[in-house]
Amino acid sequence: LTFVARQHGEAWTRPFVAVYEPSTKKEPSAIQSVSYFDAEETVLKDFAGICVKSKNGRTDHIFSLSDATQTATYQGMKVKADYAVVSNEYAGNRTLFLGNGTQLVAPGVTVHTDQAGNVLLEKKQGKWYILSSVPCTVVINGKKIKSGITSTGEMKYNNAQTTINSVV
């Protein structure tokens, strides 16, 4: 497979974003649709937003900014980062990723860091897991959880019982 893409304009003022999904006859595409969205901040010229809907019910909103100090907002989601992914909850699972950033706000979840870093927050079969490169604060459904840097952190969030393991 060879793929060539050319973008008209400067990459640092107009980010280029693409969605790739390998598929075969045995394992067909899981993507149902791809659409694009604009940030609510009309002054953002260097923003790209993609909404990827999967056949399994998962929807990912992908945010890309060339300046991590700027904020992009869309339908109640707010991101202050170079890159972020916000998924909906589907089959008891959910994924949120903050890439080189300090803030991610999504329905029911807030992630904040004092310095730019990467934070992966995943809900798998009803349990939350976190992996972060910098200390972060996570709020889930109004419950504040202060976290350090984690390597394989597990955050259990069941019936108001929260523990974070593997905090370095």
PLM features: residue spans?
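Non-catalytic terminal regions with compositionally biased, polar/charged low complexity
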Residues: F3-R14, E21-V168
